[in-house]
């Protein structure tokens, strides 16, 4: 595919693939483009940070940060697969981390690996660029909004910031993980160090 295309070119490629009632609304196409691409003089291209190699490196960095912060908080990190980690014993985890590079969360929400009450301790870690798309999807889909209500979402940038706090403790962790919501600007004050 052409790395730089106009919105009209993109739409002319997308719409024939999803005919009739499957045709995505222009607002969805715009939300996806805003999430993955940038426009320069009307030409859209994939953002550098969204190249497969960059996202792979981000996921590696997030796994390392989860392990490091967990160790500093006194928790042992268990990696159950590339995108699923826990702090503490996986049978009774203190926190559950799901790493994603997209805004696709339905399969995570349906997963029954952990008890339903574990959702309050479940964190979906995603790139900041996906936050707007996820917020858009939650606004448009009441079922998705309801299913994800008890989950916490942390952007990669917030985990990086928390990793830089030299004397992080469990209270600081808990206070800060909600400080950069998926919709809108960060709430409150991010801790300075």
Regions found by a protein language model. Name each.
Residues 1-193:
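C-terminal non-catalytic scaffold/interaction domains in large multidomain proteins
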């Amino acid at each position: 595919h052409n790395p730089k295309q106009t919105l009209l070119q993109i739409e002319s490629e997308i719409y024939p693939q999803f005919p009739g009632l499957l045709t995505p609304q222009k607002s969805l196409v715009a939300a996806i483009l805003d999430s993955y691409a940038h426009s320069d003089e009307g030409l859209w291209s994939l953002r550098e940070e969204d190249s497969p190699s960059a996202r792979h490196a981000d996921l590696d960095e997030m796994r390392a940060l989860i392990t490091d912060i967990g160790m500093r908080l006194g928790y042992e990190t268990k990696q159950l697969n590339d995108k699923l980690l826990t702090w503490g014993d996986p049978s009774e985890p203190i926190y559950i981390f799901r790493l994603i590079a997209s805004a696709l969360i339905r399969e995570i929400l349906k997963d029954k690996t952990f008890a339903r009450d574990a959702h309050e301790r479940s964190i979906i870690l995603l790139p900041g660029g996906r936050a707007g798309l996820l917020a858009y999807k939650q606004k448009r889909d009441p079922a998705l909004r309801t299913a994800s209500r008890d989950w916490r979402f942390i952007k990669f940038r917030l985990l990086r910031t928390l990793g830089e706090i030299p004397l992080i403790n469990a209270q600081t962790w808990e206070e800060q993980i909600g400080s950069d919501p998926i919709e809108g600007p960060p709430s409150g004050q991010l801790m300075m160090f």
